Amino acid sequence: MDQELDELFSLLMDEEQLLPIEELSALSDLDTRQLDRFSSCWQSLSPQRRRTLLATLGQQADEHVELLFDSINCLVLDDPDPTIRKIAIGNLWESTDPSFPAAFLTALNEDSSIIVRSAAADALGRFVLLTELEDDSLTESDQIVDDLLRTIRDGASSELHRACVKSLGFSSREEAQVIIADAYLSEDEDLVQSALIAMGRSANPVWRPEILQELLHPSPLIRAEAARAAGELELHDAAQSLVELLEDVSNEVIHIAIWSLGQLGGDVARTALLNIQASAPDPETVKKADEALEHLAFLEGTPDLLIYDFDDSAEDAVD
């Protein structure tokens, strides 16, 4: 392993070469001694090489669940480059390690960079959700919501404000609901999008009227988030509006409407998904319809024949 790491470090420090993607798995789950050696290598890398490496490690962890780079991400949480700190927090977003909320709260409250504070606010949303799911191991649960609320009340920048609103969507506290409502009623389109994301995360059907209304909004960005929220909250009376969005001018809106119909299920959703699966002009939309129909079949406990290729079957019969 030591020789493998030495070879990898040499490759990383040769910045005229592309990152050795296949060899990066050697950085997974480093022990303390190995992490010290990585730190020495890290210090010799240029800022751009560091950013590229850390972002690539995040991508590799997403694609290969057996890879764990948490120790490296934790190591660089105090890197002088704010972009590195932001990437590291993003890479740790899915971790439920109980030691991370304190680090993210420190970043939210004390970091000098708005992009880092915003990343921390985003990451804290996962721990708000865990609290709502009655995870008693999170001792900072009240402080997380309190600090997100306080950050907004202290006049956060637009980017940070939006991140806090989205994370507060996971909270059932009344103050959080007020913040979401205020964001929705603002005249800031970006903030309205964040409010709709928060509504979808809330598991609270109280937001049904707002979501149904925004499915008709002139902005495709607003329509997209409303469509997503309708699926997340399983608003069955949104089905017909979602079907109409399958003819939207925006591919993003179409794809999210497809996903949401798969979440809703029912005859209306199934018929619409089968129709677009058969008639969509591009492979990506067909793929989205396939996935939604597979999910719908899973929800309804029906036989999943959707991946059966009838054309191939016919050819086999002829042969």
How should these model regions be labeled?
Residues M1-V65, A297, L306, A314-D319:
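N-terminal alpha-helical scaffold/docking segments in eukaryotic complex subunits
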Residues D2-E7, L30-Q43, E63-D78, D97-E110, ...:
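Amphipathic alpha-helical scaffolding segments comprising HEAT/armadillo-like alpha-solenoid repeats
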Residues Q17-L18, T32, P47-R51, P82-T83, ...:
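Alpha-helix N-cap/helix-start positions at coil->helix boundaries
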Residues L18-I21, R51-A55, K86-I87, A102, ...:
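Alpha-solenoid HEAT/ARM repeat scaffold
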Residues L53, L57, A123-L129, R173, ...:
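Hydrophobic residues within the alpha-helices of tandem HEAT/HEAT-like
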Residues G58, W93, G125-R126, G169, ...:
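Structural signature of alpha-helical solenoid repeat scaffolds
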Residues L274, A278-D319:
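Eukaryotic acidic, Ser/Thr-rich intrinsically disordered low-complexity regions
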